[in-house]
Amino acid sequence: MRRLTMTRPDDWHLHLRDGAAMKAVLPHTVRQFARAIIMPNLKPPVRSVADAASYRERILAAVPEGQQFEPLMTLYLTDNTSPEEIVAAKASQFVKAVKYYPAGATTNSDLGVTDLRRCDGVLAAMEQVDMPLLLHGEVTDGDIDVFDREKVFIEKHLIPLITRFPKLRVVFEHITTADAVKFVLSANNNVAATITPQHLLFSRNILFTGGIRPHFYCLPILKREDHRLALLQAATSGNPKFFLGTDSAPHSRYSKESSCGCAGCYSALHALELYAEAFESVDAIDQLEGFASFHGPDFYQLPRNTEQITLTKSPWRIPDELPFPESGLVPLRAGEEITWQLGE
């Protein structure tokens, strides 16, 4: 196949940042996606409906003229989030989910939850009003190997969570292991998962090919090849429990290429083309539309998009660097050739 026309997709996990950084990256997402679930881990984080409303207005003001884009807002769950805030979030109609970060697990997560059980009152309110919970599914215990954090999170926190709240809609975000795939498949239909392009395309070997490769470093970290293959099988299976979430995370070149570099891969520029390469690698390009355009809105109980986009088999070179405050932004696979191209 040299040409694929499909329904315009959505990104169900996106970091836009704020201010000048947001203005630099938002056009990339708007070009590819109609909607996106916007992560709340700003400084300070988006903790209230008022915070979300203000951030939403800043995003809409930065959308390029003549373009359409709908930001789907989230709240940052803390130990102090109240059930009343959840009710207000649901009533707002623009807050679509609440995000759980284990304290210290990733970028700007210092104010995250210290113990998920402390949030049972809030989770009960979320279950009652049908507000989805988005999970960064890793433990942060210092004695747990970084490559095992997702598996331990499932056993220690996730299984007990869905047992306590069986009607709570849960998105296990950016899954990275065969263990996570198995869990999602075994759970009820209120549990789904997003998968990033980097976790479909690369194993952890890429981090050390020819030296340290900081622009492939993200959290959860890339895993072994057998885990990558399990994710690819899940994404291309047609199962509606799995859908697109880039976790595109812009960091300046300086903040990535340092003695203590930030976690995050930037893929918003070319995410759909990256997913197309992954799906084509296992002869499943026909399953891309479901994964990218249908499964997400169906889970979130939103209408599917109606606009069409076209991908063409037309190789192009990913830029070495993109404009970004401070020191530029290096996209995933910078300088390499990619085989699919999204039409204008």
Swiss-Prot record:
Its cofactor is Zn(2+). The keyword Hydrolase applies. The modification N6-carboxylysine is found at residue 99. Its EC number is 3.5.2.3. It catalyses: (S)-dihydroorotate + H2O = N-carbamoyl-L-aspartate + H(+). InterPro entries: Amidohydro-rel, DHOdimr, Dihydroorotase_CS, Metal_Hydrolase. Pathway: Pyrimidine metabolism; UMP biosynthesis via de novo pathway; (S)-dihydroorotate from bicarbonate: step 3/3. Binds 2 Zn(2+) ions per subunit. Substrate binds at residues 15-17, 41, 136, 219, 251, 263. The keyword Iron does not apply. Gene3D superfamilies: Metal-dependent hydrolases. Keywords: Hydrolase, Metal-binding, Pyrimidine biosynthesis, Zinc. It is an enzyme of class 3 (hydrolase). Coiled coil: none annotated. GO terms for biological process: 'de novo' pyrimidine nucleobase biosynthetic process; 'de novo' UMP biosynthetic process. The active site is at 247. GO terms for cellular component: cytosol. Pfam families: Amidohydro_1 (PF01979). Zn(2+) 2 binds at residues 99, 136, 174. Catalyzes the reversible cyclization of carbamoyl aspartate to dihydroorotate. Belongs to the metallo-dependent hydrolases superfamily. DHOase family. Class II DHOase subfamily. NCBIfam families: pyrC_dimer. Homodimer. This is Dihydroorotase. The lineage of its organism: Bacteria, Bacillati, Cyanobacteriota, Cyanophyceae, Oscillatoriophycideae. The gene is pyrC.
